[in-house]
Amino acid sequence: MRQHDRWPASLLLVRHAESAGNVARELAEANGDPLIDIALRDMDVPLSELGERQSRAVGLWLAGLGRRAPSVVLTSPYVRAERTASIALAAAGLELPLVLDERLREREFGVLDRLTKAGIQQRYPDQAEARSRIGKFYHRPPGGESWCDVALRVRSVLDSVTREHSGKHVMIVAHQVVILMFRYVIERLGESDVLRISREVDLANCSVTTFAVDRRNPQGMTLEQFNEVFPLEEAAAPVTREPDVPLAPR
């Protein structure tokens, strides 16, 4: 099989819609609270009402893709991602099975889970210092993951996609860092490249990032769109973003 024949025809990456956790985190950061006030496990946090509306907007956009509509859908098993995918497919009228893949889950935060910037500084100042010194690409909090760890998961997912879904239109619903790591792996970026992208943009909820197979590109696929929100704008759905916690310069 030739190199380009291994890839899907297109790869559509969608960040999950706004969740109740996004709302709680924004409130905690605004109030300077050390802890995000939500009792659920991160993987169980549901969408907000706005998040459900955003998901339907993505579905309406999917319905208009015609021959480029997804034929395969993979999603993080976290509730906010799975519900985004389910609602979008229903709104699009696409009857496709969801493939839940734990490799697409959110980055594990370990001991820093549910802590705000202020909370991390108060409870784990050593981790704040380590992240500042090492940088967030390589820093791994106790019990958690670095961005490199997420990149390893993404490489594994891409191995599966190229093996099982070559030539197909594949949609993946996942999380902010996971989507950034898809760019890192597919485009063969360096640490400084992906950190620059992270500094410049915060991925919007339900934003769309697309790659298409490109026979002129030795890497196999070319980035077509990144962090686009036109599906939301076309449906007059509010755009929301959850910025990365700025523990250290990015």
Specify the residue positions occupied by each region the protein language model found.
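Glycine-rich phosphate-binding loop signature in dinucleotide/nucleotide-binding domains
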Residues: 65-69, 161-168
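Acidic, low-complexity terminal tails and accessory targeting/binding regions
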Residues: 1-11, 94, 107-121, 184-250
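Active-site-proximal alpha-helix that buttresses catalytic centers in soluble enzyme cores
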Residues: 2-96, 100, 123
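Phosphate-handling substructures
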Residues: 20-46, 91-155, 222-227, 235-242, ...
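Short, active-site-adjacent cap segments at secondary-structure transitions
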Residues: 20, 80-82, 106-107, 178-180
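Short, well-ordered beta-to-alpha junction loops that form the rim of enzyme active sites
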Residues: 16-17, 75-79, 97, 103, ...
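Active-site signature of alpha/beta-hydrolase-fold catalytic machinery across serine-
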Residues: 87, 181-185
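Residue-level preference for the first positions of well-ordered beta-strands
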Residues: 11, 165-173
